[in-house]
Amino acid sequence: MISTNDFQRALVFQGGGSLGAYEAGAYKAFYELLSERDKNTGREDNIFDIVAGTSIGAMNATVLVSYVKESKTWKGSAERLIEFWEHLATESGIDKIPGFTEWWNYWH
């Protein structure tokens, strides 16, 4: 019989622009579920062995891995990823540049 310690757990994010924001929320729910499940298995310090992504998913993976590398824990990683997306959602002020709206409407 193979024990659960013999398995590696991978987290893979896909690409798709704004889908990355959805992935942040999905990751938070998934992380909470796994954290609760792993409390008695000794995995709580290493929720995922492999983290990968493509396109915007690679950005999500980078945010998570850099957080875990700096803080030495997965705890707080979901909040950090959501914080990243909330920061992206704030106004940039680009629409205040004279002529931008007309340019955008023309090319959009």
Which role does the model predict for each range below?
Residues T4-A10, S18-H108:
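Patatin-like phospholipase
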Residues M1:
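An N-terminal RHG(E/S)-centered segment typical of histidine phosphatases
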